């Protein structure tokens, strides 16, 4: 469905003769370690983690600290979460509605259908809570578009001509081999649970392409509604 939606977006010409034909999602944080400037995994890191991660598609580069966090989680029989950033650079202003079908709510509805999603933020996101209005406001330039993008490309639920920027938080994998205490309904007592088998230490490494697909579906809906 995401592929079909991307085709719809590529064919949907917007007023300035550009098309919404580019959606870019990437991992920017793993286990609390920010490596947003890295895009490809080193060969050594991929070789070290590929068995545990069962990675598919293009690999990611890890900084030394992110690689260490992954290694440590594997050794501990544990798992870690991650943050995926998605950018839609070429979308014109005027898509979305100010209430039920705001751009943020339509995209969020689609993104939260992905298993493991625990949060989403647009633009400055939760950092905006610590800002003053003078910091968070996006001045408008002579062409009618914002000069900065703290709003993440959306004002009042409607695209403002700037790139749509949002980040998605993924939880750690639930099934881990590290022993945990939980209630055993068969015995009626607390018991030790240790999940057997092979599991992803960070399943979020697989998700950027899924985030892109769901974003494409949401944007196709918004274009159809306009």
Which positions does each model-derived feature cover?
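Internal helix-turn-beta structural module
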Residues: 173-226
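Glycine-rich, mobile lid/loop segments that gate access to catalytic sites or pores
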Residues: 1-99
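Electropositive phosphate-/nucleotide-binding environments in soluble metabolic enzymes
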Residues: 60-64, 97, 101, 105, ...
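Context-gated lysine
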Residues: 6-7, 50, 75, 127, ...
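Alpha-helical support elements that line or immediately flank enzyme active sites
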Residues: 1-12, 105, 109, 162-164, ...
